[in-house]
Amino acid sequence: MSRVIGIDLGTTNSCVAVMEGGEPVVIANAEGSRTTPSMIAFAESGERLVGQQAKRQAVTNPENTLYAIKRLIGRKFDTEAVKKDIAISPFKIVKADNSDAWVEVRGQKYSPPEISAMVLQKMKKTAEDYLGETVTDAVITVPAYFDDSQRQATKDAGKIAGLNVLRIINEPTAAALAYGLDKKKDEKIAVFDLGGGTFDVSILELGEGVFEVKSTNGDTFLGGEDFDQKIIDHIADEFKKDQGIDLRGDKMALQRLKEAGEKAKCELSTSLETDINLPFITADASGPKHLTMKLTRAKLESICAELIANLEGPCRTALKDAGLSASDIDEVILVGGMTRMPIVQKKVQDIFGKVPNRGVNPDEVVAIGAAIQGGVLRGDVKDVLLLDVTPLSLGIETLGGVLTKLIDKNSTIPCRKSQVFSTAADNQPAVSIHVLQGEREMAADNKTLGNFELSGIPSAPRGVPQIEVTFDIDANGIVHVSAKDLGTGKEQSIRITASSGLSKEEVEKMVREAEAHAADDKKKRELIEAKNQADNLIYQTEKSLTEFGDKIDASEKQKIEEGVAALKKALEGSDADEIKKASDSLMQASHKLAEAVYAKTQGAGAEGSEQPHGEQEAGGAAKGETVVDADFEEVKDDKK
């Protein structure tokens, strides 16, 4: 089995790790950073920028720079959560044909799994560059409170990125794996995970290599992005009071506010006050306007007080579902960049009655846990058993619009449960199975995962036919449902891809497009490299012609000049092969010139090394050769 990488696909940042010599290693990207911004930008030239490159140009290209796409994954366009995002996003969120929330950039529509796949491709490439081999197998993490359609969409993103997703695991569970791998004692821990877009809390029991999740709860629409938005609104309101201009109407100014707000939030984790300076933020008839203000930690905490208060409910519910009190918890592990905020740490201490453990890196621990799970699946990590749970109850709609639960929340997965139902009317030829996920009593108040029909039921009075409905949740937390007429043995099943999910054909089409785009990227890179080498060759040749052109025949000189002209013409086009061919021709034509350069430098070296003794003269010649080598090394460097 090939190497398995662990990927933390985050709302704000992503991270990749792998097992090396029995230890998990976080891999730095091409820019030297151990985390990569989960951002994608579409440049005017058609080029796609991923990560730090995308983040750097976000201010000047806000409408075509996508971020926090994880908040849209597996969601319908008409949900309240998506409407909230539409109001604050500089990019366009649109309704897809399947009612999903998609994005539109430069006239092209993309699904959230497609955009997430671009981030995953960057993580895959980062791992491949480090390992020096092709990587196909991965473990990808998701928030514990992700529902079935969000998990399925994440798995689709992996497939589009060219990855074989061996397992989808919950972020808090991954963090617990990383924390508890070398712990020998039995303990009960709470993992408090507040990331860029989601909040999870999981209660686990650890002991003898067994990691058993007792309960999980959370909010998939509460995270750092919401804190940033509160800061943006505060800054914009203050500026409006002062200058009478609402910056929220200007997408470029809004992006600058977002960056400044995020920076201020980070700075206030270690200092009590920070300055926000944004010169030339906007202009009116009286001239340019500058934004200058101070933000204190106390003010930040007051404007985010509502969000901080919302962290308590899921923690209390998770404790209750686990049958534990706060005093039963031995350690509280902090995960996610937002847990660096002092007010968040204080809230955790208030809820659990103990100082949280800050011994793990909150940005990297989830990817490390995913890599460990990859090691378990590959057989490299022994004596580790992970028992995860399903975060939400699953059931079907029954007579009167009621949700009848078959699998309760916090059931250990994988699991299977069957129940026998019957028809609601006489001679009913078919039953429609409406699959739901959620905790509300009425079906309409829960999330629809899918619908399917079992037909061909023989005529019989109502209540007579025996229809067995079976729910099966796999280790990824993805649901399979079947219905069987026990009288006839007829069966119908569905693998839930959610009514708003991508079809198999759509996923395969996106895989092909991603592969084609990777090939385009390779061609673009080859063209850029060929142009750079050609530019350097022209520069070196023209420089040598100026200095040594009189040392060669006029006919040779003309050939070189013609070669330079031909290469310059090839550079006007975008055919890498033509440029390479013209470069080779110029190099062939330049041989005589290279000899003249060599002879000149050789002569200079020999003159400078005249000595009274024979041996010294030989040494001088050697020294001259070294000078020549260095000269040629310099030419090579220029060509690179």
Curated annotation (Swiss-Prot):
Task: Kindly list any coiled-coil regions of this protein.
Answer: none
Gene3D superfamilies from the entry? 1.20.1270.10, 3.30.420.40, Actin, Chain A, domain 4 (3.90.640.10), Substrate Binding Domain Of DNAk, Chain A, domain 1 (2.60.34.10)
For the region Disordered, what residue ranges are annotated? 600-640
- Write the record's keywords in alphabetical order, separated by commas: ATP-binding, Chaperone, Nucleotide-binding, Phosphoprotein, Stress response
CDD domains listed in its UniProt record: ASKHA_NBD_HSP70_DnaK-like (cd10234)
**InterPro entries named in the record:** ATPase_NBD (IPR043129), Chaperone_DnaK (IPR012725), Heat_shock_70_CS (IPR018181), HSP70_C_sf (IPR029048), HSP70_peptide-bd_sf (IPR029047), Hsp_70_fam (IPR013126)
Stretches with biased composition (Acidic residues): 628-640
- Tell me what turns on expression of this protein: By stress conditions e.g. heat shock.
Q: Any idea what job this protein has?
A: Acts as a chaperone.
Q: What is this protein called?
A: Chaperone protein DnaK
Q: Which organism is it from?
A: Geobacter sp. (strain M21)
The gene coding this protein = dnaK
